A protein has these predicted regions:
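Phosphate-group recognition and catalysis centered on beta-loop-alpha active-site segments
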Residues: 1-120
């Protein structure tokens, strides 16, 4: 069985998508599902529109500290696939998949060699 936390393993709403929640999840051996958006040219972890205090996708990979735990990445904006793939390769993270409900967006992600899942 594979267990994924949702926005990290948070104990209060304020911890969602925050470092403490990701540390807790990864330290227990759980992967996570989270959302990636962009703000001012940076990839950030945020379910809603970024406010400026989000951790970056690169910081999330640093928190993983080389643990190749499963990541389910919901890409929330266009044009991020190449940078996401670059960072995954930089951190040698292979245990991931991206997903999106938009078929055209998934086609773009597939062209970049990202692993993509969908629901029909």
């Amino acid at each position: 069985m594979i267990i994924l936390s949702h926005r990290g393993y948070w104990k209060s709403e304020e911890e969602r998508n925050q470092e403490v929640a990701f540390h807790r999840s990864f330290d227990l051996g759980y992967g996570t599902e989270t959302d990636i958006r962009d703000i001012q040219g940076k990839l950030v972890i945020s379910h809603d529109m970024p406010q400026g205090n989000e951790i970056t996708f690169e910081e999330l990979l640093q928190i993983m500290d080389g643990r190749n735990l499963p990541l389910a990445l919901n890409i929330k904006a266009d044009g991020m696939a190449n940078e996401i793939l670059r960072l995954l390769k930089q951190y040698n993270h292979t245990n991931y998949f991206t997903f999106d409900m938009s078929i055209p967006d998934m086609v773009v992600q597939l062209k970049t060699e990202l692993t993509v899942f969908t629901a029909l």
